[in-house]
Amino acid sequence: MARRPLLGRSHALDGLRGLALVWVVTYHFTSSRGPFPGGWVGLDVFFVLSGFLITAMLLDELRTHGRLSLPMFYARRACRLLPALLVMLAVWTVLLLAFSDSTWFAATPGGDGSGDPVDISAALGQVGITLAYGANWVYALGSGDAPLAHLWSLAVEEQFYVVWPLIVLLLIKLPAARRVWPVLALAAVSATLPFVYYDGGLGTDRIYFGTDTRAVGMLLGAVAALTWHRRRSTGRPSWRPTARAWVGFTLIVVFLLAVGNGPVKSLIGPAVVALAAMQVVPYLVDRPSSRLARGLDGRVLVWLGQRSYAVYLWHYLLATWLNPLPSLVSIPVGVAASLALAWASWRWIESPALRYSRRFRPMPPAAVMPQTARPRAIAAAA
């Protein structure tokens, strides 16, 4: 008989995503000179969340249906990611063509304020690269234009989404107790590569933006999911989960407040923050009544977490466009506009697309029908 899925809705994970979004948006609007010099840690939290959720959902599909449908998985990912991205890129392209000579398309948020107009052909080429989810390699090679620079992280995640289900199909051929070890080995390689590249003379851009060096976050998220799923399936207790979660969260905050732009950010930052976040994420799922989970389960953070994708898509463009204005104007206007656009995107673009994506879910056996709404809810935020 098919078994019920293990992954249900977690408002605390939404809240963690919302908190990570606050860190990233603040970092971009204040050019790392604001209250969160290490706001880049929010991206590493995103990566761990993505690795955990995608892996847990794939394992749940296998547990519930006895198989994985790759076409349906890719269709669901397309429904989740493409509509909002296409709208944002369309709006940006129209504005770019309409105001191509305007200094409002300055180089970077918080840059030197020179206001050099963006090269139209290069910018339009970047749209194509973004749609192909290869933007991170443009920046890794040091040839990207700034207005869409933030989309490099989406490229890394999408490359992971393409490859990871294929790896999961191989992993499930192993005994459950052994599945985690190949993934840990891959994560160790990804965490080591920055030092190899740095010693070899490669620049920090290649290290920071490369898929091979940034996969560590999603791989450690996958490790957390594999461990969590096996533990929940067997009923085995976790070792000191509360202590590990608080140590992990504290370490993330230390990096957030103390580690700005520099070699640490590229060399050890992603791996250390990912190691810390992988202690937090499964704990929030297991202990929704814990102090840490309740602290993240606030209405504002959950709202932000559920709409984080659209906020992330729009905020950097607004930070770029508003850069010439005084920060007392650009920051509140940019943040407010980002939230308004995210609200509209969630209501009229993302929510309809998510409803449409349900047709790409395998029909569950009758024995598990009452539980199917729960994993769908959490999947919507992944």
Question: How would you label these PLM feature ranges?
Answer:
Residues L7-H11, R33-L43, G115-I129, S143-V156, ...:
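Interfacial loop-to-helix transition and helix-capping segments at the boundaries
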Residues G8-E61, C79-L86, G125, A132-A135, ...:
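Functionally critical transmembrane alpha-helices in membrane proteins and complexes, commonly lining
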Residues L16-H28, L49-S50, M88, R178-Y198, ...:
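Small-polar-interrupted transmembrane alpha-helices in polytopic inner-membrane proteins
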Residues W23, I54-A56, A90-T93, F160-L174, ...:
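Membrane-interfacial alpha-helical segments at the cytosolic side of multi-pass membrane proteins
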Residues A56, M218, A222-V223, A243-P352:
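Alpha-helical transmembrane segments of multi-pass integral membrane proteins
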Residues D60-D101, F105-A123, I129, S153-V162, ...:
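Transmembrane alpha-helical segments and their boundary/interface "anchor" motifs
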Residues E158-A188, A225-A243:
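Solvent-exposed interhelical
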Residues D297-V302, S351-A382:
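Membrane-proximal cytoplasmic C-terminal regulatory module of class A 7TM GPCRs
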